[in-house]
Amino acid sequence: MKHHFGDLLDRTDDYWTTVPNIERYAYLADKEITDKELVKVLTIGKEQKHWEQVFECPHLEELTLHSPSTEQVQALKELPQKLKRIRITFLRTKDIEFITALKHLEEVIFEYVSGFSDLSPLRQLIRLKSLHLENLRRVSNFGGLEGINSLRYLHIDGTLDWNQPIDNFNFLQRLPNLEVLSLRFVINRTPFPAFLPILGLKKLRKIKIGRATFNTKEYAFLQAALPNVEGCNWDLYWDYNDNYEFLGKGAGRVGKKNPKAKVRCDEFETMFNDMKKEAEEIIKQNRFE
């Protein structure tokens, strides 16, 4: 699947200042730049003959690498140390060690980056506040994110035709300042309660999770664990296309005109409340200090 170029970044608060995806081409380094002192945003890729100008822009703050060459990626360590934001799209690489040279990065976006599996080099970015990971084909273990104490916003995503696997969510309990957790088109590989580590996130303000991404019991757990967190108020049954769609992956539906529709919805609500009670007991036994 080719990149959508949609802007999936949460523009509330100060999490993201990276230019929207569709605007990346407005900053192409495809011709000679006359006043390099004024340049703060650039886009380069293997098609840009004048890409080396990037080293002559002393005030560069943001860089997009769109289908970059190996030479361009390896040259990142030579960039001005004022670089705060980077977006890399369509890259195959054996590792992401190159990112460690960019110590001042605050916002990092990886889209369609494949060939590597270890995210731990990101730990070297001690100012990293926002991280967007989309369609990382070789990654399933996100333990490499543990210990990024500056991280406030995390988005993990797949695509319409491929779901990003996540082995477990243990890494969450070692992201002490995380405020926003966003999960889209993902596959959970951990049995219930997969989100137990989320109890350690004392600063979490918002979660963004689709209503059919996880088993119903996981949604019940999240509601019980995060009663005051924005995004945990999913409708138990959603009015959609003449049906009531029940909350949870594979939870089913009932036609609105079905004479037993109300009974089915009431039964689901009762079941969900029982799940929340079970979750509350688990939380009492496992609450992180």
Stretches found by the model and what they are:
Residues 2-96, 101-117, 121-288:
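Concave beta-strand-loop units of leucine-rich repeat
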